Amino acid sequence: FVGIQKLGACFSYDPDRQLYEIEAKKLKGAYMLLDEASVTGTANILMAAVLAEGKTTIYNAACEPYLQQLSSMLNRMGARISGVGSNLLTIEGVEALGGTTHTILPDMIEVGSFIGMAAMTGSDITIKNTGYDMLGIIPDSFRRLGITVEQIGDDIHVPTHDSYQIETFIDGSIMTIADAPWPGLTPDLLSVFLVVATQ
């Protein structure tokens, strides 16, 4: 809500109807530093700011592939967004947007879940059209658990495993898997990694 309010919108809540309402005559560009690099928060601010009057600057913006593709689509529709793929987005408001066609990215959480499922069950799987270049460290994180993750074009092949061995460092210690904002590991896959690591 805070980012949209900084653009000039007013929120109200009616407890009797349990309803939030938002109102704004005209949104105006603003500077904002987000408390957290929220994907949903950044996306909502971005969609509002492209039609706001003037310049909006978002520091600590989320930069996950989801935001990159949203920004690319909005730019093709006539928006003026710069800094795509970084944590600093600058949006010059435009009067209107036009139409476009867009193909959405495969869901990286689904791709990671399928890799984990194949590893847990010792199954052979080929995952088609994974958007491999936008998976970040997901494939390498599974490889560090000893899982063979083969890239074949935009597909991923995980062959049958009877067992797998977690990599150790030169001193014999084992790795730590932790979530982090993009390009780090998405927290949505930690439960999958936890189960895979215990098999």
Q: Predicted segments — roles?
A:
Residues 1-199:
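Structural preference for solvent-exposed beta-strand-turn elements
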